Amino acid sequence: KPSAMEVACAVDPFACVTHLSAMEFHGLTDRFSKILYLTTPPDKEWREQAQERMARDLGQHMAVHRAARLPMLRYLGFERVEGVRVELMRRSSRGAFKAIKSPSIRVAMVGRVFLDMVREPDNCGGMQHVVDAYREYGSQYLSLILDEIDRHGKPIEKVRAGYLLEAVCRIQHPRIDGWKAFAQRGGSRMLDPQGEYAPTFSETWKLSINVPSLLTDGRGGEGQAGEDLGGE
């Protein structure tokens, strides 16, 4: 019996498995999510891609197909697949993904998954889970993370990822140092975009460290994730 991932990727030919579901596929989490996270293009882009796909697949038979009023490729929204709840995100930029033959799915590449973790942590198990994933796998996938975030990360995402790699994973790298140029005061920049602002901040990354587990580790209140934490 095909999995929910396989069915979803068959029903929507432009959707790919992302966020916590992609973390699960790549072995970046020990959680078994009860939600299937998928990303597909917005409506206008989806229709354009559908036209291109049909033109490519049918070739010279496209006109005959239309004349016969045969079904066109169209978007079918769905909230559940094989009994699994679906969280479907419409995004212009799905990022890099790969097509797997068995199971027959499309899934976000590892580097993209690490970018999505700092972009939308709530769809990746929450910020604490993101911290844990970076701590455990950041070194292993460092080159993929650096390439993806260098190329596609927004300034705030470079700052969040840079903090996690340097202060949490204890990784030193020239490209991470380069991201420090994106650190800036003001605007209440926070490590967890969905959390509340915390007065404890990283001097280096100009970032409110609003994840409780990173604030103390029993060493006289020193930050668990580096020695540059201060208070306002």
List the predicted regions and their residue ranges:
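Short, amphipathic alpha-helical interaction segments positioned at domain boundaries
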Residues: 2-20
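Phosphate-handling catalytic interfaces
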Residues: 25-232
